[in-house]
From Swiss-Prot:
Ranges where the record places region Disordered: 19-67
Catalytic residues in the record: 276
Catalytic activity: L-seryl-[protein] + ATP = O-phospho-L-seryl-[protein] + ADP + H(+); L-threonyl-[protein] + ATP = O-phospho-L-threonyl-[protein] + ADP + H(+)
Top EC class of this enzyme: transferase
Gene that this sequence comes from: HD16
Name of the protein: Casein kinase 1-like protein HD16
An example Gene Ontology molecular-function term: protein serine/threonine kinase activity
Keywords of this entry: ATP-binding, Cytoplasm, Flowering, Gibberellin signaling pathway, Growth regulation, Kinase, Nucleotide-binding, Nucleus, Serine/threonine-protein kinase, Transferase
EC number(s) per entry: 2.7.11.1
Location(s), subcellular: Cytoplasm; Nucleus
Family per similarity comment: Belongs to the protein kinase superfamily. CK1 Ser/Thr protein kinase family. Casein kinase I subfamily.
PROSITE patterns: PROTEIN_KINASE_ATP, PROTEIN_KINASE_DOM, PROTEIN_KINASE_ST
Length: 707
């Protein structure tokens, strides 16, 4: 029964793991021969020939889209995606399905520029540099002095920076009266200027006077450009790293660490996260000035709020896997996966920055191609802190462990993070970087002793460097009913089990595969009145599926095996009125988002090796859906979705990733209880226990759960 909490009814939601993990080693699994095409009762099809075109069947007038779906911001290229056919069916009224060779192909066009190179690797909401409008030779904005535009200092995702020399007057090195300033130009056609001045202006205005953030003295528009007049600064940490032989001492990097943490603490206290922490965005003060050893954090073009300005509450969690903001080399894993930015992400990027400055290289450098972000994220998840920091002093490993284990809305313990590096920092005379901010944080600690081991409960590590795969089973509360499972089913025995279940009034509700053997869940609560299935040597046999669509069957369960074969189950008695599916070499989030906008919802998913198959249907009974995609079981994301009313309705996993579709049903069930379980073997020992609590398997898959 639901529990009453805080004045509202909340369902019982549990995620349980059985700690009998086995290593992921698909190559060691027994491989059965690729099956010949087989058709279950009431079906009928030849062996599959593979999907070579996109096809659409004629049918009834499409329903109006239901649900608002998720709005995707097309900021960067997809994860690796070799698009395979999309197939759409409409329930036939007359005639055969007509092929449309044009055919709803999804154009996955990247909207960013990629700044490729060992120091950049940046995907961002970048401006279109196709404009050839020269920057003004002379600049005067607002009540500023007049400046002559001199040499170019650099170019980023949101603009370009030049030296500005004052035409007359000015005698100081910094401040509004400086002889030299930095002029940042952003073209009015830049994506950041669609609605007027750049968003960065608003951030600088809010952060005015914030420790470690350079001052903006004047701003305004001149011709086609929005212009910021800022303090001139010195070399970046990237420049310094290059000048000292591409390796910094642990002492120097420790000084950088504590001061950078202090700067981020001040920035975060204003409600913002930076979003692009890296060596190129940390600059020292102007050479010869009093600030030449002071650290500054620049480029707020990707800054975002972690705290709502009006309410002061933490922003809501979300994940949009097609959105990436930052620089690939230093971005947090959560940024790669499209999760809403929060304070933990800046700190994870700082950890990679510090390790890079000491080691001179990160293990994920060198990847190229459209799937670069995917490969880098996969490598980050697979690299344990022990391995990544094997040539670094222990404090850097401890720092990385702490920040990569933080929750989405967790407040960082900045004093504790700074205190990690106390033993590496020498006296004031030998410090290459001023650590004024860190010292102030230390003064706040006062006489308190920060115990690094005992002041809080130890957290479970999320990145072990030992990938593993498991069964993931999802259980929903139902009225008592008959349910049956079969696992380790060979191709030759599949028909026998299904026939026996049909004779007992059971229909297939979900299917899965592991090591080229099948798992079947059959129950009496599907509501189906007829069912057909096909075991094919290809992954989702288009011709057979379209043939069944013509007979008013709809896909209700799919599974794929490592050897590329698939099991497709189609049923009558569903509420669906239209259906579409896609096979892709990567998780097809952009296609899913497109279909959401057309009123479809995900109703089945499967994988075959590293290929994904996703089925979407109209009139599925959901008002909204979201995706949780990760290189491990996304426990935090699932629990956050549960708390906001979502329930898991589809699951699938490859040896690399696990994906979960969570939905809000239009009709709220009497009992919303949902539980998940992860086991190294099929959960036969646990299912009966669940049945005794009226919890029944709703979805099951086998794949990556641990990194």
């Amino acid at each position: 029964m639901p529990e009453l909490r805080g004045g509202v009814w909340r369902a019982r939601l549990r995620s349980k793991k059985v700690y009998d993990v086995q290593d992921a080693d698909p190559a060691a699994s027994p491989v059965s021969p690729a099956p010949r095409g087989r058709t279950g009762r009431r079906g009928g099809a030849a062996a599959g020939r593979g999907n070579k075109t996109v096809a659409e069947g004629g049918g009834r007038k499409a329903l109006k889209p239901r649900g608002k779906g998720c709005r995707a911001v097309d900021l960067c290229k997809d994860q690796p995606c070799k698009d395979l056919p999309e197939v759409i069916a409409r329930k036939a009224v007359t005639g055969k399905a007509q092929e449309d060779l044009g055919l709803n192909k999804v154009a996955d066009r990247a909207a960013n520029l990629m700044m490729d190179g060992e120091s950049g690797d940046k995907f961002a909401a970048a401006e279109d540099e196709s404009t050839t409008t020269p920057v003004p030779e002379r600049v005067q904005v607002g009540n500023s002095p007049e400046y002559i535009t001199d040499r170019k200092l650099g170019k980023g995702g949101f603009g370009q920076v030049y030296v500005g020399r004052r035409v007359s007057g000015g005698g100081s090195r910094t401040g509004p009266d400086a002889q030299e300033v930095a002029l940042k130009f952003e073209h009015r056609s830049s994506k950041g200027c669609n609605y007027g001045p750049p968003y960065e202006w608003q951030v600088y205005h809010t952060l005015n006077g914030c420790y470690g953030i350079p001052s903006v003295h004047y701003k305004g528009r001149l011709g086609d450009y929005y212009i910021l007049v800022m303090d001139m600064l010195g070399p970046s940490l990237w420049d310094v790293w290059n000048s000292v032989g591409q390796a910094m001492s642990a002492h120097m990097v420790a000084c950088i660490a504590v001061e950078a943490i202090s700067i981020l603490e001040k920035l975060h206290s204003k409600g913002f996260v930076h979003g692009d922490v890296k060596p190129e965005n940390f600059l020292l003060g102007h050479p010869g000035s009093v600030d030449e050893k002071k650290l500054f954090l620049i480029d707020l073009g990707l800054a975002s709020r972690w705290k709502e300005a009006s309410s002061g509450q933490h922003v809501d969690y979300d994940q949009r896997p097609d959105v990436f903001r930052g620089t690939i080399r230093y971005a947090s894993v959560h940024a790669h996966l499209g999760r809403t930015g929060s304070r933990r992400d800046d700190l994870e990027s700082l950890a990679y920055t510090l390790i890079f400055l000491i080691r001179g290289r990160l293990p994920w450098q060198g990847y190229q191609g459209d799937n670069k972000s995917f490969l880098v994220c996969k490598k980050k998840m697979a690299t344990s802190p022990e391995l990544l920091c094997c040539f670094c002093p222990a404090p850097f490993k401890h720092f990385l462990e702490m920040v990569t284990n933080m929750k989405f809305d967790e407040e960082p313990n900045y004093p504790k993070l700074i205190s990690l590096f106390d033993g590496l920092i020498e006296g004031p005379a030998s410090r290459p970087i001023r650590i004024d901010g860190a010292l102030k944080v230390g003064q706040k600690r006062g006489r308190m002793v920060v115990n690094l081991d005992d002041d809080e409960q130890p957290k479970k590590k999320v990145r072990l460097g030992s990938p593993a795969t498991q069964w993931i089973s999802v259980y929903n509360a139902r009225r008592p009913m008959k349910q049956r499972y079969h696992y380790n089913v060979a191709d030759s025995r599949l028909h026998q089990h299904i026939e026996k279940g049909n004779e007992d009034g059971l229909y297939i509700s979900c299917v899965s595969s592991s090591a080229n053997f099948w798992a079947l869940i059959m129950d009496a609560g599907t509501g189906f009145c007829s069912q057909v299935y096909e075991l094919s040597q290809v992954f989702l046999h288009k011709d057979w599926i379209m043939e069944q669509w013509e007979k008013n069957y709809y896909i209700t369960a799919i599974a794929g095996a490592t050897n590329g074969s698939s099991l497709v189950v189609m049923s009558k008695g569903t509420p669906y009125t239209q259906q579409s599916y896609k096979v892709s070499e990567s998780f097809p989030y952009k296609w899913i988002n497109k279909k959401w906008k057309e009123g479809f919802h995900v109703t089945s998913m499967a994988t075959a090796g590293n290929r994904w198959g996703v089925v979407m249907s109209r009139n599925a009974g959901y008002s909204h859906q979201v995706v949780e995609l990760d290189f491990l079981y996304p426990s935090e994301g699932i629990h956050r979705r549960w708390e906001t009313g979502y329930r898991i309705t589809s699951t699938a996993a490859t040896p690399d990733q696990a994906a979960f579709i969570l939905s809000i049903p239009k009709r709220k069930p009497m009992d919303e209880t949902q539980e998940t379980l992860r086991t190294s073997s099929f959960p036969s020992n646990h299912v009966k226990e669940k049945w005794s609590k009226n919890l029944y398997i709703a979805s099951i898959c086998y794949g990556r759960t641990v990194c």
